[in-house]
């Protein structure tokens, strides 16, 4: 599905564009960038309480995260078997690749600050393999999920070359 045809993204884009939400997201992004700078990890994140959005989020949204991934990083394949993910590029750029029946499809994302939905957003249905390649600048994103933070599962292949083989699952919340 293209981001522009996802009705949930249309609502999220409007919510994120409000000045109060924008200020809160920028502050969270600043904290997560600092967290990444002081760690050795490939990425850092912070969970944004849904109360920060008031009552304007679609009912299906159960968690929101700010992620920052190191410059030049390649994340490898992962998927969330229990959540539909929608991500907005906040700073930097990169390529979100989604795995479909015909192989990997690239979705280049940039942080335009404009209303260009296809350039800034990606929609990832549950259990869809995805991987990221980050530009030479750290890439900050806002990700919305359809499960609560403590329920979000990251699944990775045991053998990166065999996406149909055995996988390893881990919950994001509580891990660092």
Each model region followed by its residue ranges:
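A short, N-terminal "cap"/entry segment at the start of jelly-roll beta-barrel domains
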Residues: 1-61, 112-114, 176
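Ordered hydrophobic segments in well-structured contexts
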Residues: 64-69, 86-89, 95, 140-143
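Double-stranded beta-helix
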Residues: 1-2, 100-117, 129-176
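Glycine- and acidic-residue-biased ligand/ion/polar-headgroup-sensing regions
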Residues: 81-103
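Short, charged/polar surface micro-motifs in flexible loops or helix N-caps
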Residues: 60-62, 70-74, 93-95, 102-103
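Short histidine-centered beta-strand/loop micro-motifs
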Residues: 54-58, 75-81, 87-88, 133-134
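Conserved short histidine dyad/triad with adjacent acidic residue
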Residues: 65-86, 124
């Amino acid at each position: 599905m293209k981001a522009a045809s996802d009705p949930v993204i249309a609502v999220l884009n409007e919510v994120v564009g409000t000045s109060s939400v924008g200020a809160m997201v920028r502050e969270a992004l600043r904290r997560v960038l600092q967290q990444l700078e002081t760690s050795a990890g490939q990425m850092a994140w912070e969970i944004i309480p849904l109360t920060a959005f008031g009552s304007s989020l679609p009912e299906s949204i159960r968690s929101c995260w700010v992620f920052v991934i190191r410059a030049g990083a390649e994340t490898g394949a992962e998927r969330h078997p229990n959540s539909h993910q929608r991500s907005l590029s906040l700073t930097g750029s990169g390529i979100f690749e989604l795995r479909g029946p015909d192989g990997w499809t690239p979705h280049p994302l940039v942080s335009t600050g404009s209303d260009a939905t296809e350039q800034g957003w990606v929609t990832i249905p549950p259990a869809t393999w995805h991987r990221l390649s980050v530009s030479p600048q750290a890439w900050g994103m806002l990700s919305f999920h359809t499960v609560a933070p403590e329920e979000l599962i990251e699944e990775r292949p045991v053998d990166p070359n065999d996406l149909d083989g055995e996988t390893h699952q881990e919950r994001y919340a509580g891990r660092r």
